Amino acid sequence: MDIDPYKEFGATVELLSFLPSDFFPSVRDLLDTASALYREALESPEHCSPNHTALRQAILCWGELMTLASWVGNNLEDPASREQVVNYVNTNMGLKIRQLLWFHISCLTFGRETVLEYLVSFGVWIRTPPAYRPPNAPILSTLPETAVVRRRGRSPRRRTPSPRRRRSQSPRRRRSQSPASQC
């Protein structure tokens, strides 16, 4: 199966691969960030958003992977084999988890559209030959934040903007007042 964990969010594995591996913070830093910003929503039995669900699943997968890695590390007697397992997990699996955590934390913090715009901007920047691109890459934190903090409980009322009334280009007409309306 060819499963792309970003597809339902409008991104792709390829789009995230434009960001260099050293761009993503450590798993520990990302877990601390997720906990500090979204602990209540992540631990809640209520469904908050698809990003919360994906973030929750990535955190659980990382925990299971660490349990497996610890078990393998404790049961492999050959130090070279143990080192290979640790390096593989940190290099390959760790990068995928760091990308997932970063993507969903960023979507919750900045908004999905802003993150997608950033990924496309960075992808264009990195593929442009150095002589023709600005010296600095786009920075996500300089884009406007769109995060909305919601309280648990009732979902907020959605308000649609009222349509703007078009003003006539002709001068305003005054209503003539009838004698009966001058009470």
Swiss-Prot record:
| Keywords noted in UniProt | Capsid protein, Cytoplasmic inwards viral transport, DNA-binding, Host cytoplasm, Host-virus interaction, Microtubular inwards viral transport, Phosphoprotein, Repeat, RNA-binding, T=4 icosahedral capsid protein, Viral penetration into host nucleus, Virion, Virus entry into host cell
Where is motif Bipartite nuclear localization signal found? 158-175
Placement of sequence repeats on the sequence = 155-161, 162-169, 170-177
Q: Where is this protein found?
A: Virion; Host cytoplasm
Residues bearing PTM Phosphoserine: S155, S162, S170
Tell me yes or no: is RNA-binding among this UniProt entry's keywords.
yes
> For this protein, what is any one GO molecular function term?
RNA binding
Which BP terms does GO give this entry?
microtubule-dependent intracellular transport of viral material towards nucleus; symbiont entry into host cell; viral penetration into host nucleus
Region named Disordered: 143-183
Compositional bias ranges of the Basic residues kind: 149-176
Checking InterPro entries in the record gives: Hepatitis_core (IPR002006), Viral_capsid_core_dom_sf_HBV (IPR036459)
The main location class comes to virion
Gene3D superfamilies, sorted: Viral capsid, core domain supefamily, Hepatitis B virus (1.10.4090.10)
| GO cellular component entries | host cell; host cell cytoplasm; T=4 icosahedral viral capsid
Transmembrane regions: none
Q: Where is this region: RNA binding?
A: 177-183
Q: Where is this region: 3 X 8 AA repeats of S-P-R-R-R-[PR]-S-Q?
A: 155-177
Tell me yes or no: is DNA-binding among this UniProt entry's keywords. yes
Tell me which family the UniProt entry assigns to this protein: Belongs to the orthohepadnavirus core antigen family.
Role according to the record: Self assembles to form an icosahedral capsid. Most capsids appear to be large particles with an icosahedral symmetry of T=4 and consist of 240 copies of capsid protein, though a fraction forms smaller T=3 particles consisting of 180 capsid proteins. Entering capsids are transported along microtubules to the nucleus. Phosphorylation of the capsid is thought to induce exposure of nuclear localization signal in the C-terminal portion of the capsid protein that allows binding to the nuclear pore complex via the importin (karyopherin-) alpha and beta.
Which protein are we looking at? Capsid protein
